[in-house]
């Protein structure tokens, strides 16, 4: 979500979770 990406810290954490889900 855009509101999550707005925060670098949260965005980075979300990216990790998304990367895990993708694999």
UniProtKB/Swiss-Prot annotation:
Similarity comment text for this entry: Belongs to the MSDIN fungal toxin family.
Chain positions of cross-link Cyclopeptide (Ala-Pro): 2-8
Location of cross-link 2'-cysteinyl-6'-hydroxytryptophan sulfoxide (Trp-Cys): 3-7
Organism: Amanita fuliginea
Descriptive protein name: Phallacidin proprotein
Function: Major toxin that belongs to the bicyclic heptapeptides called phallotoxins. Although structurally related to amatoxins, phallotoxins have a different mode of action, which is the stabilization of F-actin. Phallotoxins are poisonous when administered parenterally, but not orally because of poor absorption.
GO molecular function, one term: toxin activity
Keywords for this protein: Thioether bond, Toxin
Propeptide: 1, 9-23
PTM description: Processed by the macrocyclase-peptidase enzyme POPB to yield a toxic cyclic heptapeptide. POPB first removes 10 residues from the N-terminus. Conformational trapping of the remaining peptide forces the enzyme to release this intermediate rather than proceed to macrocyclization. The enzyme rebinds the remaining peptide in a different conformation and catalyzes macrocyclization of the N-terminal 7 residues.
């Amino acid at each position: 979500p855009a509101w999550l990406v707005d925060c670098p810290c949260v965005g980075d954490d979300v990216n990790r979770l998304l990367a895990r889900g993708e694999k």
